[in-house]
Structure formats: structure tokens, C-alpha cells
Amino acid sequence: MIWVSLDEPRRALPNIHEFGNDEWVWVNCGPYEWNAHSSRQLENFTDFGHFPWVHPGLLGDIKRPVVPAYEVRTDGHVVKYDIVRPEAPNTDDFPVFANASTQAPMRTSHYEVHTPFTLLLHLGWGDKEGMVYFFVSQPVDEEHSRGFLIIGRNYNYDQPDSVLQEFEDVIFNQDKTIVESQLPKKVPYDITRELHM
């Protein structure tokens, strides 16, 4: 992934302090080509309420679908929020998360939404193990986007990259079907132009 500024940058790039740390390994996933605007791709990545319904047994637990309360705050141009929420236990096919609990595991997520169409997500499970998602959606045009994802973790050092890549391919394909059906293709600034259920 290459960032280019044709003029003086308006904002700094997101600070990912785990980059360069030898205890972290990094996996490139995607790219993910969608027939949807980048705003939809990013919106989907920040919406954890759909996990139990769209990704049951992978990201969400259908027996614990309620989204706990959380607070959204801004820090300059960055939107931040933290949430502790139910997570599905690891599966035999995709043992990608560091949750030790096989019964009702919980996950702490720290979200940072940056402009343009960029997300930095830190995951934790209460111990030293952690995971970092760095997602950027490239607008191709008003109705198409290309998502790039880099994931870092400080555990599962011997696990082949393909396990995490295949997991993300499954997740993104499940989301793609739904997001590509949403109208308008671009997230409207006027919330009355959409029906939220």
C-alpha cells in the first residue's frame, strides 16, 4: 500500500505503533473489489451489530446478539470508540483469534476512523495477545471500491498467512452480498434518505 499526497498533507497518517516491532507479524489480505462506494465499505467495517446475523460462529454469537452501550468521541478529525462485546469462539477451520475462552468469549475493540475511508482497529482479549486491523477503502468511482487490509498479531507466529487470508475472504464475501444491494450506493449525509432497522 502506497500513500501519495500531491500537495501538503492535511492530516498525518494513522499511527500504528506496532509496525516495526519484532513481536508482531503482518498479513496482507485482499484486495476486495466491491460494487459499492468506499463509504459503504467503511461503514460495513465499523458496524459490529451485524456480526451475529451475517457472520454467526465466525465473528458473532447468535445467542448474544445485543450490542452493549459504548461512547463515540472525536479527537481532531479522528472518530474513536471502544467496545467490549461478545465474540464467537474460534473454529477448527479458522483459529485466528487469541480468545482463550471457548464458552462465551468477549473481545475488547478500539476503533479509530480516519479520513479518507480508513480504519485502525485494535483487538484484545484481556491478556498480552493483540491484533491490529488497518483497513483502507480506495474509491474507484462513485459506485465501486477496492478495500486493502493489513492485519498484525503478536501470537500464532507459525500459522500460515493463508489461514487468516481465507478467513477474511469468507467474511468480506458474506458482507459484499449485502452491501452491494444497499441503495444509495454512497452513504448519504442526510440520514432521512435511508431506513435503519
Predicted regions mapped to residue ranges:
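Active-site-proximal cofactor/substrate-binding loop regions of enzyme domains
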Residues: 1-3
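C-terminal catalytic domain of Rieske-type non-heme iron oxygenases
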Residues: 9-197
